[in-house]
Amino acid sequence: MSDLLGILKQQGQSEEFDAIKIALASPELIRSWSYGEVKKPETINYRTFKPERDGLFCAKTFGPVKDYECLCGKYKRLKHRGVICEKCGVELALAKVRRERMGHIELASPVAHIWFLKSLPSRIGLLLDMTLRDIERVLYFEAFVVVDPGMTELERGQLLNDEAYLDAMEQYGDEFDARMGAEAIRDLLRQIDLEDEIRNLREELPTTNSETKIKKITKRLKLLEAFYESGNKPEWMIMDVLPVLPPDLRPLVPLDGGRFATSDLNDLYRRVINRNNRLKRLLDLNAPDIIVRNEKRMLQESVDALLDNGRRGRAITGTNKRPLKSLADMIKGKQGRFRQNLLGKRVDYSGRSVIVVGPTLKLHQCGLPKKMALELFKPFIFSKLEFRGLATTIKAAKKMVEREESVVWDILDDVIREHPILLNRAPTLHRLGIQAFEPVLIEGKAIQLHPLVCTAYNADFDGDQMAVHVPLTLEAQLEARSLMMSTNNILSPASGEPIIVPSQDVVLGLYYLTREKVNALGEGKIYSSAQEAQNFYEAGHLDIHAKIKIRMPKEDGETGYHLVETTVGRAILAEILPKGMPFDYINRTMTKKVISKVIDSCYRKFGLKETVIFADQLMYTGFKYATRSGASIGIEDMEIPDDKASIIEHADNEVREIESQFRSGLVTNGERYNKVIDIWSRTNELVAKSMMSKIATEEVTDAKGNKVRQESFNPIFMMADSGARGSAAQIRQLAGMRGLMAAPDGSIIETPITANFREGLNVFQYFISTHGARKGLADTALKTANSGYLTRRLVDVAQDVVITEDDCGTDTGILMQPLIEGGDIVEPLHERVLGRVVASDVYIPTQTEPVVKAGTLLDEEWVEKLEKHGVDQVMVRSPITCQTRFGLCAKCYGRDLARGHLVNTGEAVGIIAAQSIGEPGTQLTMRTFHIGGAASRATAANNIQIKTKGVIRLHNIKTVTHENKNLVAVSRSGEVTIVDEFGRERERYKVPYGAVISAQDNSPVEAGQVIATWDPHTHPVISEVSGRLKFVDLIDGITMNRQTDELTGLSNIVIIDAKQRSAAGRDLRPMVKLVTDEGDDIYLAGTNVPAQYYLPVDAIVNFEDGSLVGIGDVIARIPQERSKTRDITGGLPRVADLFEARKPKDSAVMAEVSGLVNFGKETKGKRRLIINVSEDQCHEELIPKWRHISVFEGEHVERGEIIAEGALNPHDILRLLGVGALANYIVNEVQDVYRLQGVKINDKHIEVIVRQMLRKRVITFAGDSKFLVGEQVEESAMLQENDKLLAEGKQIARGTPILLGITKASLATESFISAASFQETTRVLTEAAVSGKVDELRGLKENVMVGRLIPAGTGYTYHQSRKAKRARAAAGGDSSATHTVTASDVEHALSEALNADNHEH
């Protein structure tokens, strides 16, 4: 019994720790771990296969090879436990102690630990203030270092080569001490007085001015303080003793054929021991210095290889030229200890099989093959068999199961009832990739899956496989049932929309069922109920599409009945509607979108149970009527429009016209290309339109004999229209024309495929089709990997974001407005704020009382109210502004999207956010090839046509008035908005430079009016004053070419690229100036800036030197480069760039301060732009000359306004415009990419990630804190320190937020375990060890790795109670925190447990 107690106690020990600390090990500590020294390189005896004594597998040091058996065989059996054999010296214990007992090697000469030497920045180098190169010269015996200068002129740490050393010896004799090798470095480290050094550096810091020096001092200071505070001693970075890994962790296993497979570590250890022993021998023999030195160097190298092979010099290779795997390689990378064993574990009780469709299942069921069930539930069956007395022993039960006796099947039925199982489909990209079902036993060998969960799993039945897992414990079963059951996962956690939505056949069936047909059998009849109509239909007296009237009960709680116009099919559908659901929800043609809306409102109105039943019924009905409809695909169904040939002929003529214009020099090649592409895009649209109108409608005769058009019953049209399968774009390729294709580089090939698939392609057309198809396949493979990596980085950065409190009490938030792009409201306000908590009261102009009070969770009813009152901006709480220290609060997060109520504490919202953003990434990347690479490019926009009536407002647009009275825009970032009579913005458009605006500011405009036009294919250069044109630096043949056209004699002036110019023209800056007739400069209105325009490469000048130019004339035009097709290929890397916060190339220059702009003296290649804030304060920027500067002399700019065009740099946005603007920017940019693909993701997921990117602060003012100016610290750490300082009445530290990319943010997390398991393991662990870091085990990863429940979900309460218990123990010395158990206690507990077991059965 006491033995059992010992085991219980042991198990208890490993559990009870609250944090993990990593530090440097002192030689004493290493010796204390060791059970003996390893003196010989031998492993096992080749004849007896027993471990050699004092060797690498020595049983005396590491423990017995067999349980409780000594090596020589004198003692065997349990009764001698703990005895040490006199003959062979082995202690009798379990053989598994060979996994935990360490040995050690006493090194004859100290060696440096390579991690602290070579891991940049070199820790040893920083401490000694020496360069890595110098230290290496000392360590590898190339130079002497002065350890103690004595009374000489030498300095401590000075390097001497052999000659200098000999000279010094002659000069000073024994007065000084200079040595080589690790011991010299060790002595130098020993001499460092940490306290003294820290004090000196702290005093030196304020007095230094040079940036680099300050950086260096702060680096050193941080390292010294880390050593000082952690209690690590610098000399421990040099090792005298080397620990030896327990032998079972570097095993030697016999293969068949008498050979052995061994871990690489044994080779590496053998080298170290051999060299060490040789060195000992040489030292005993007093060998010559040079030999000893060489041996010491070899010892240093062999220890380096053991710790981190290949870090310095060439990696040591084994027999097969493969580098040996060192200790460092064991822990890093995907196959290392962290990711392979600690974070990824394999499970038992699982099986996998192919899936097939189970259309008869209920939503919570799945079909499980009997064979699998029998195998998976074996232990349950054994215990039941024993319990019922059908088998006496487990062995007998096993036999019965193997014979598959009939009673076994009954018991299996019994065991399986209500025992949920988990189904998982790889890749598991979001939490809906594992769901729980109740198994239904089936014959056959395939798992049956319910069709409605396929969307969540992204499964299809073309050979997909799925894995089954069995939750064993009661808690696991409970969780599976209450949280993971498929019926509990109706809404997608990414967007909050239903994910249990019928698709494909079901949609087609419901669509067919609810369509109307003119003049169908029984049209116009009236029935007393839906049931009666159904009976007539079944009897064959009614067509399913016939328009009829039915007496229906009134809705909205009124009593009585009314007649409803509907069709027979819709009446049938009404039968399965939940009670109380309005009939007009389904009294229409059911497309996929409509069905999704119906399911959504059913969930909101009636809750989970009703919705699940309704969804199932919808599915059964859908399948039934899809079968009845007999819809199929026939070649005849792809109807080619009659006017296709004439449309294409017309396009051919247009293209010929443009070709001839090109030949006569009226347009450039680039313009010609763009125009041709445009013509074919438009033609494709026309053919598609014509084809759709032919396929979509048919002519029929109504009851009165008139010809009418109705929607056709063409199966292909029905499939696309209902949303079951296919799209207009695909039908266009089947029956219209395939259209333009993309070349492998993404550019569009200008000869389109005019044929469609029904007509068939010729060889040339087939060939250019293959580009797209291949590119699609190659992209898929590459991008799947990229997307998976993005998801991994996102999970890593957000893994510890958990809801930890109900309300953090902040009143800040972010301002939400509807997203307006072009004329469309891309996302209305009510969609954006749904499920958020209001941060401050919402008012409307006419009322004094707020419409919505702060702290309200906006649900469907509230947003409807906002919509009704026409509110166009709401301040809502956001994860970005949440004040919770560790984690988030429920109010700032808002609604749990998958459940529809305020989020619960303990919800792991970080992981959900990462999955929601990462999962579609993979989806989208897999989706490129479906259209087969057909180039989809919208015809280039060339005007603004407005959609609503209102008043036009111009926003920061500078215009000049052309002689024909039109306004011409001469600013880049201008916008026009249309506002309604309440002043609410309805439409917003960007106005490009050079657009001709035909309406005045603040003038009323009508819907459909065109208010601006421009040429989409060129960028114009517009004159803002009138005058004579003067060429500067435009020299024929050097900076420009005259391209004369033979046919017309017209010539164009084209600027040559600077890279292609001769040496003479390299530094010339071609530009045009406007001058008066006398040749004086003309200045822009109201400024002293001369009117001059730099001409970029390829610009075409429209006027000759000396011509007269009017205001608003186009002086030159710059052809735009060919357009590339947009798809998520650009998208996924774009998302990654945003989350990594990369600085874009040629990023926009933003104004650092608000003030007036003027230009200073130009330097070579740069312009100096000065912003004057006040008389004495100004800010200068140097901007390269080729950059287009969008502000003019004397203009007023606001801080953060764009001065030079380019991509925005997120770091600048944060610095100049603040956190809110940055959040807005990242959220909108990421959403743009996903929106393009039609993927809905809720904003708050992106906000959670942005919050994690903004965790750090850069200290701007240190106060009395321990921080240094310029240091990066966690916000929570800064707040904690400030709390402490405030309590002591000292000055607090201040810092500004800084943006880190997700990889950097993950590596900069407080938890070193989490960071080390992510990337750059060596660097993270080195840093952590030096500073003696403590991991508080706050996040999810750390807890998974130490084998605990995660502090989220159901594990959250467990962690809370542990925390409370700890606090109690700390406060009152609570005895319950430490258990002392007596043997009798344990016996009592055991007997109780055993009895309880019997009662259960």
Curated annotation (Swiss-Prot):
Keywords: DNA-directed RNA polymerase, Magnesium, Metal-binding, Nucleotidyltransferase, Transcription, Transferase, Zinc. InterPro entries: DNA-dir_RpoC_beta_prime, DNA-dir_RpoC_beta_prime_bact, RNA_pol_asu, RNA_pol_N, RNA_pol_Rpb1_1, RNA_pol_Rpb1_3, RNA_pol_Rpb1_3_sf, RNA_pol_Rpb1_4. Its EC number is 2.7.7.6. It comes from the Bacteria. The keyword Transmembrane helix does not apply. Its cofactor is Mg(2+); Zn(2+). Zn(2+) 2 binds at C808, C882, C889, C892. Binds 1 Mg(2+) ion per subunit. Binds 2 Zn(2+) ions per subunit. One of its GO terms (biological process) is DNA-templated transcription. It catalyses: RNA(n) + a ribonucleoside 5'-triphosphate = RNA(n+1) + diphosphate. CDD domains: RNAP_beta'_C (cd02655), RNAP_beta'_N (cd01609). Zn(2+) 1 binds at C70, C72, C85, C88. One of its GO terms (cellular component) is DNA-directed RNA polymerase complex. Mg(2+) binds at D460, D462, D464. One of its GO terms (molecular function) is magnesium ion binding. Pfam families: RNA_pol_Rpb1_1, RNA_pol_Rpb1_2, RNA_pol_Rpb1_3, RNA_pol_Rpb1_4, RNA_pol_Rpb1_5. The keyword Magnesium applies. Belongs to the RNA polymerase beta' chain family. PANTHER family: DNA-DIRECTED RNA POLYMERASE, DNA-DIRECTED RNA POLYMERASE SUBUNIT BETA. DNA-dependent RNA polymerase catalyzes the transcription of DNA into RNA using the four ribonucleoside triphosphates as substrates. The RNAP catalytic core consists of 2 alpha, 1 beta, 1 beta' and 1 omega subunit. When a sigma factor is associated with the core the holoenzyme is formed, which can initiate transcription. NCBIfam families: rpoC_TIGR. This is DNA-directed RNA polymerase subunit beta'. It comes from Legionella pneumophila (strain Corby).
